Amino acid sequence: MVESSRNAHLWIVGSGIAGMAVAAVAIRDAGIPGEHIHILEQLGIAGGSLDGAPSPKEYAGWVTRGGRMLEEEAYCATWDRFDSIPSLEDPAVSVRQEILDFNVRVPTHSNARLIDKNHEILNAAEYGFNTADRAELMRLLALSEKALGARRINDLFSEHFFQTNFWQMWRTTFASQNWHSATELRRYFVRFIQEFNRIHTLSGVRRTKYNQYDSLVVPLQNWILDHGVDVRFATRVTDVDFSDSAGSRRATSLHIDTDDGKSEIALGENDYTFITLGSITADTSFGSNDTVAPLIRDRVDRSWSLWDEISKKETDFGRPNTFYGNVDENKWESFTLTMHGDLLLKRIVEFSRNDPGTGALMTWVDSG
């Protein structure tokens, strides 16, 4: 550890998997003392989109807002990070090895990837491409991001492509909509091109043993806390001040809002800040069996409003409005089922011919 690392303080905005990974890498690879690392989180729980907590609306219910299907060819940084984080069940085994061992015992191979409106399982191995679809796919991959510009996916593909089995599987695996960015789709195609020939079974997926809050977030959180990291919940960062000198820009202070009032954290010469902006689960609202989740349109969540404030300072901080400007085209819904019996689980197993944990995703292609 060099002296500059010993004196450095890290201020991390957001306790999602990215923020906690920064803390863990700083301790493991840079030798920064855990006591010099501070995580500021507006919620009362860590994990970001991978959080897991009792439902605020439904008695005896549980909510996980997001999830991630891992695979061995991608997520290299994730595998590296969790290779040195001990499993909760067996500290002699890393979280990475626990996941890989679990997938040897419980491999993913969907037998019911697509279901039609007549409750029939479709032959998902038939992707449904015609010659025009293949040509349009090749054109998307061949074009540069500059050439694609602001075009949408439906600007690049004909209607037939959106009716193919391939698109039904791809869009429900990666949460793509026809009107989303063509550039974003191209990035996904390039990153996950190895999934093209197995997306009908999702056999490339590596699942965590339990939900990802318990299998990933909790072990990582425990590890950084054991190393002395300072985690502050209910702490909202509302703005960041910067200074520019000799062509170098650095953050100089963080504006903080807590239940106790407003304050500022001054950042010294040896301080660094890492900020998570624009979460896909920002402005989450909750419903129940009897109530509808309200739609939030005014960016209550700080991950977007903070980016708004920062972007006003310099144009190269990006344009967050590009992503949140049309709420109706970017909102999404999810459901977390809390079951107190196994009847539904047995029915799903009987219908899909997949034991629990082996089927990954089931898509009802006529559901909207």
PLM feature spans:
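Glycine-rich loop(s) and the adjacent beta-strand/alpha-helix scaffold that form part
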Residues: 257-357
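Short, solvent-exposed loop/turn and secondary-structure capping segments
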Residues: 49-52, 184, 284-289
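Conserved FAD-binding subdomain of flavin-dependent enzymes
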Residues: 59-99
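Helical element adjacent to the flavin cofactor pocket in flavoenzyme catalytic cores
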Residues: 191-272, 277-278, 290, 296-300, ...
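Rossmann-like flavin
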Residues: 88-194, 206
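Beta1/beta-strand and adjacent pyrophosphate-binding region of the FAD-binding site
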Residues: 2-18, 38
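A short, Lys/Arg-enriched amphipathic alpha-helix followed by its capping loop at the start of a domain
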Residues: 22-35, 223, 227-229
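Glycine-rich FAD pyrophosphate-binding loop
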Residues: 27-56
